[in-house]
From Swiss-Prot:
Residues 1-49 are cytoplasmic. A motif (Endocytosis signal) lies at residues 14-15. InterPro entries: C-type_lectin-like, C-type_lectin-like/link_sf, C-type_lectin/snaclec_domain, C-type_lectin_CS, CD209-like_CTLD, CTDL_fold. Residues 274-390 form the C-type lectin domain. Disulfide bonds join 265-395, 268-279, 296-389, 368-381. This is C-type lectin domain family 4 member M. Ca(2+) binds at residues 359, 361, 363, 366, 377-378.
Length: 399
């Protein structure tokens, strides 16, 4: 029986798997799988564990490879960043090197600037204005050039300018001579400060001229000769720009002369106001501009024509005190926008400042000028206003 089983076992051995690998035996009967339990089953579990370990090892190896690939991929970008940083460092080093190269020139510029400052201070005290202005202009140009820290070619130009400047300063008078000149100027300034102002002298001279003209019309010959002699003396004294004591004497003589003259006649007719050789009449009634021109002509006068800033201030004060709108002899009737006085003279550009704000505006054919508040205004010529007449002063005797 054993002999019969042995060939069967060998035949089955051809169909049996290794129990260490699968733990399953195949039988030709019914061609089905049959699992053998017991210790054969334990051996199959151990086979599965080895597979799991192999799978885990493979996954770990794959993770390591992925990590290596990631690190390797970062290397080019890191190298590129490192290269750009090196370029930036190199550029900064180049700029620093250039800046260091300019430091020596900067110290030289500071030296030049100090010399220029000293020269400017010295020249600023000198009295020769034309020469000083030329030097000061050169100093200003040099200072501006030095302040800009110029390049080397500019430095050479500055050195040349500085050399010429030093030569120019060397031609100026020495300090002791300057002090002498300055003292002389100080004395002259003090002396001039004691003299009467030019406007005051002109006023005195004008009054003297007017008095002389008025005296010429007086009938008493002996009295006229006496007054004329005093006028001649006063005129000569004023022409010599006398010192303060002489001025007081002139003022006293002038006062006495005016007092004596006023005993003989008045400057202006009754109800007229005298100012700087002229007589002014401020009306108490109102007329339009054309009738105001006629009213002044009837008394041998003229609707006021303003010649000086002093006269304007005087008249503006008179009208503002009385709070009256008063006609003056100014209009643009001949040509719109071209203002003329009644004597035919044009309005001076310097008088444009006397118009009130926004005037003249020609609102409703306003062609005639009036005193209004603190300035001038244009108004319609047919409006009734007060008016001001003007004529030269003369001798008017009391009746």
């Amino acid at each position: 029986m054993s002999d019969s089983k042995e060939p069967r076992v060998q035949q089955l051995g051809l169909l049996e798997e290794d129990p260490t690998t699968s733990g399953i035996r195949l039988f030709p009967r019914d061609f089905q799988f049959q699992q053998i339990h017991g210790h054969k089953s334990s051996t199959g579990c151990l086979g599965h564990g080895a597979l799991v370990l192999q799978l885990l090892s493979f996954m770990l190896l794959a993770g390591v490879l992925v990590a290596i690939l990631v690190q390797v991929s970062k290397v080019p970008s890191s190298l590129s960043q490192e290269q750009s940083e090196q370029d930036a460092i190199y550029q900064n080093l180049t700029q620093l090197k250039a800046a260091v190269g300019e430091l020596s020139e900067k110290s030289k510029l500071q030296e030049i600037y100090q010399e220029l400052t000293q020269l400017k201070a010295a020249v600023g005290e000198l009295p020769e204005k034309s020469k000083l202005q030329e030097i000061y202009q050169e100093l200003t140009r040099l200072k501006a050039a030095v302040g800009e820290l110029p390049e080397k070619s500019k430095l050479q130009e500055i050195y040349q300018e500085l050399t010429r400047l030093k030569a120019a300063v060397g031609e100026l008078p020495e300090k002791s001579k300057l002090q002498e000149i300055y003292q002389e100027l100080t004395r002259l300034k003090a002396a001039v400060g004691e003299l009467p102002e030019k406007s005051k002298l002109q006023e005195i001279y004008q009054e003297l001229t007017e008095l002389k003209a008025a005296v010429g019309e007086l009938p008493e010959k002996s009295k006229l000769q006496e007054i004329y002699q005093e006028l001649t003396q006063l005129k000569a004294a004023v022409g010599e720009l006398p010192d303060q004591s002489k001025q007081q004497q002139i003022y006293q003589e002038l006062t006495d002369l005016k007092t004596a003259f006023e005993r003989l006649c008045r400057h202006c007719p009754k109800d007229w106001t005298f100012f700087q050789g002229n007589c002014y009449f401020m009306s108490n009634s109102q007329r339009n501009w054309h009738d105001s021109v006629t009213a002044c002509q009837e008394v041998r006068a003229q609707l006021v024509v303003i010649k000086t800033a002093e006269e304007q201030n005087f008249l503006q004060l008179q009208t503002s005190r009385s709070n009256r709108f008063s006609w003056m002899g100014l209009s643009d009737l001949n040509q719109e926008g071209t203002w003329q006085w009644v004597d035919g003279s044009p309005l001076s550009p310097s008088f444009q400042r006397y118009w009130n704000s926004g005037e003249p505006n020609n609102s409703g054919n306003e062609d005639c000028a009036e005193f209004s508040g603190s300035g001038w205004n244009d108004n319609r010529c047919d409006v009734d206003n007060y008016w001001i007449c003007k004529k030269p002063a003369a001798c008017f005797r009391d009746e």
